[in-house]
Amino acid sequence: MAVSLWQQCIGRLQDELSAQQFSMWIRPLQAEMDGETLVLYAPNRFVLDWVRDKYLNTINQFFTEQMGSDAPKLRFDIGSRPASKPAAPAASTKSPVAPAAKSPSKPSFNSNEPAATANHRSNMNPTYQFDNFVEGKSNQLGKAAALQVSENPGGAYNPLFLYGGTGLGKTHLLHAVGNGIIKNNPNAKVVYMHSERFVQDMVKALQNNAIEEFKRYYRSVDALFIDDIQFFANKDRSQEEFFHTFNALLEGNHQVILTSDRYPKEIDGVEDRLKSRFGWGLTVAIEPPELETRVAILMRKAQESGINLPDEVAFFIAKRLRSNVRELEGALNRVIANANFTGRPITIDFVREALRDLLALQEKLVTIDNIQKTVAEYYKIKMADMLSKRRSRSVARPRQMAMALSKELTNQSLPEIGDAFGGRDHTTVLHACRKIAQLREESHDIKEDYANLIRTLSS
C-alpha cells in the first residue's frame, strides 16, 4: 500500500518540480517497505541529504493527506534494494525518457565482455579527477550527477548532458567520470572525444568504404563521452550516424555523456529528434564560478604549484576575473611565472602590475552602464526603465537582474550600485541579489537568462 502511494507521491512531485529537479533528485530514489517503515534508497550521500532537506516535508505531507494517522514512517538509506526498479514511473509527462529496455538497475559494464574491451586503451586524462575538481554552487549539481554516473554508469542519468560556457570544468568532469568508471572496472571501454573527431572518423570511414567498421566500433563502447556537441550543427550525415549510435548505446544500457556551450534546445542546426534524445536523461547547467569558488580554485592551484598565495591576493584576482576557470588559472600561472623570474613576493601591487593588461581589459568591458544596456536589450525594455520607479514585473525583474549582475561582475559597492539605478538604497540592491539567487534555484528560465547574460557580458 505504502509503496503504491509512493508512486502517487512521485506523480505529485513531478507536477510540482522542474524536469531537471525531478530527474536529479526524485527519479533515482527506490522504495521498499521494512515492517511499518517506508525506506527510500538514494544512490549517494549527496542525493540523500538534498532530498531529506528539500523534499521531506512535502513527502510527509502527502502521506498524511492520503493515510492520516496510518501514514508510514519514512527512513532514508544509501544504496538500492535487491532486484529494484527505478522509483520514477516509466513515462514522464514533463520530459521524454529513454526506451523501456534501458533499466538503470542492470550494470552495463561486464568484465567478461569481448577481448576488444579489455584491449582498449583509454584516452582519459588521469590528471582530471573528482578530488581535484573545486566544487561550488555553480557546479554542485554537475559534479553530483557526474559522480553518480561514475558509480552507476548506464543508470538513471543516461544520457547526462552538461552545458555551459568555455572553461567552466565540463571537460574535467567528463574525464573524472571516465577515470572513475575505469577504476571500478579496468576492462570498461570508455571513449572520450571532441565532436569534430567523430565527424572526421565518419568521413574517413566513408572515404575508405569502412562505414560498417565505424558503426561497430562506436556501438561497442561501454561509455561514450562527446565534448562540444554543438559542432554537429548542419552536419546532416554525422547527425544521422550519431542518432543511430546514440540509440544503440542507450538500448544496451551503455553510458552517454554530452557537453555543449548552450542548452540542448538552443543548439541551432541540430535535428529535433536528437535534441529530444539529449533530454532523455539529465540536463545540468555548469555556470561561471561565484567569488568563493574562484578564490578556492586559485588557492588549490597555488597549492598544487607549491606557492603560498596570500588570501588577500586570491580575493583581489577573483574579484576582477570572473568569466571562467581557465582564465583564472591562466592569470595565476602568469603571476607565478613573473614571481619566479623576478624573485619578488606575490602582493596585490605585484599582481596589479603582472596582470595590468588583463585587469584593464576587464574593467573596460564590464561597467554598470554596460550591464544596464545589455539587460535592457535582452528583456526588450527601455534603458530609462532601469532608473524608473515602475514596479511591474516586466520592468522590476530585469532591473533586479541587472543589479545582481552588477554586484557579481563589477567591484562597485551596494550603495554605488543603488546610486546607478536611480538613487536606490543599498538594501534594495541586496534584496534584488537575494531574489535573483532564489529564482535561479527555482526557475529554469531565470537560470538560463542569468547564464546567457553572464556569457554576453564576459565575452
Curated annotation (Swiss-Prot):
Location within or outside the cell: Cytoplasm
Chain spans, region Domain II: 91-122
Disordered as annotated region, ranges: 75-124
Gene Ontology molecular functions: ATP binding; ATP hydrolysis activity; DNA replication origin binding; lipid binding
Keywords assigned by UniProt, alphabetized: ATP-binding, Cytoplasm, DNA replication, DNA-binding, Lipid-binding, Nucleotide-binding
Region (Domain I, interacts with DnaA modulators): 1-90
Signal peptide: none
Binding locations of ATP: 167, 169-171
Region (Domain IV, binds dsDNA): 340-459
Top-level taxon: Bacteria
GO CC, alphabetical: cytoplasm; plasma membrane
Stretches for region Domain III, AAA+ region: 123-339
Keyword Translocase found: no
Residue stretches of biased makeup (Polar residues): 109-124
Composition bias type Low complexity, residue spans: 80-108
Gene Ontology BP, a term: DNA replication initiation
Protein's UniProt keywords contain ATP-binding: yes
InterPro entries assigned to the protein according to its UniProt record, in alphabetical order: AAA+_ATPase, Chromosome_initiator_DnaA, Chromosome_initiator_DnaA-like, Chromosome_initiator_DnaA_CS, DnaA_C, DnaA_dom, DnaA_N_dom, DnaA_N_sf
Annotated domain remarks: Domain I is involved in oligomerization and binding regulators, domain II is flexibile and of varying length in different bacteria, domain III forms the AAA+ region, while domain IV binds dsDNA.
Subunit structure: Oligomerizes as a right-handed, spiral filament on DNA at oriC.
Cited NCBIfam families: DnaA
Role noted for this protein: Plays an essential role in the initiation and regulation of chromosomal replication. ATP-DnaA binds to the origin of replication (oriC) to initiate formation of the DNA replication initiation complex once per cell cycle. Binds the DnaA box (a 9 base pair repeat at the origin) and separates the double-stranded (ds)DNA. Forms a right-handed helical filament on oriC DNA; dsDNA binds to the exterior of the filament while single-stranded (ss)DNA is stabiized in the filament's interior.
Family designation: Belongs to the DnaA family.
Stated name of the protein: Chromosomal replication initiator protein DnaA
Native source organism of the sequence: Shewanella loihica (strain ATCC BAA-1088 / PV-4)
